[in-house]
């Protein structure tokens, strides 16, 4: 049972709520450096976990996890790798969502001078990000983005703001030997 792994913090959510049998949810405010330091974290999410397994099934060679808080670390890593990149968005239950598309656009904005962009979805993501860049939170709020509506209904506006804030976590989770570990650019 994942909820009983000795010495590990077990966490996860299903549909925006702490998953049954786990200790914690996926709010960034549950994981202060002093709380999580030197501990393993076992995390499952409604959409991200599924995307990770999908990437593995498709034979992805190099998997990282990314979000606005680690945007610069992600961009630096992608530029340093100098390989073709596929940005795979976790979405929400097989449906496109605004915040994932905004993040893909932000990555494209940071790496576009180093890569050729040859996909309309990338062009659209970058255009959306360019429009939203002045205030990402207000953009998703004003557009009544589905994730915004769902999470704000739970009182998680602070989490949304945190997750849309670029470069506040200089960490790069890299998938190696069956788990995500801290990587470097």
Regions found by a protein language model. Give the residues of each.
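Class I S-adenosyl-L-methionine
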Residues: 1-35
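Short, acidic/turn-prone active-site loops that include or flank metal/cofactor-
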Residues: 13-18, 48, 67-71
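Internal active-site segments that recognize and position negatively charged phosphoryl groups
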Residues: 50-55, 72-78
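Short, structured patches in soluble enzyme cores that scaffold and shape functional sites
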Residues: 43-47, 65-68, 87-91
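Glycine-rich phosphate/diphosphate-binding loops that line cofactor/substrate pockets in enzymes
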Residues: 77-85
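Short hydrophobic beta-strand segments
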Residues: 10, 84-89
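Long, charged alpha-helical interface segments
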Residues: 23-46, 50, 54-62, 98-185
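Phosphate/ribose-phosphate-bearing ligand recognition and processing surfaces
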Residues: 90-100
């Amino acid at each position: 049972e994942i909820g009983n792994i000795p010495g590990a913090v077990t966490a996860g959510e299903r549909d925006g709520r702490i998953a049954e049998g786990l200790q914690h949810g996926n709010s960034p405010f549950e994981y202060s450096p002093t709380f999580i330091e030197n501990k393993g974290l076992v995390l499952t999410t409604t959409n991200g976990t599924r995307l990770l397994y999908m990437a593995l099934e498709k034979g992805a060679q190099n998997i990282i996890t990314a979000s606005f808080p680690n945007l610069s670390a992600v961009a630096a890593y992608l530029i340093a790798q100098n390989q073709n990149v596929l940005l795979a968005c976790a979405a929400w239950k097989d449906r496109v969502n605004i915040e994932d598309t905004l993040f893909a656009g932000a990555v494209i904005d940071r790496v576009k001078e180093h890569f050729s962009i040859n996909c309309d979805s990338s062009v659209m993501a970058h255009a959306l990000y360019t429009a939203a860049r002045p205030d990402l939170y207000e953009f998703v709020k004003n557009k009544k983005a589905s994730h915004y509506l769902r999470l704000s209904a739970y009182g998680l506006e602070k989490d949304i703001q945190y997750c849309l804030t670029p470069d506040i976590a200089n960490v790069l989770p890299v998938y190696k030997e069956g788990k995500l570990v801290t990587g470097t650019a």
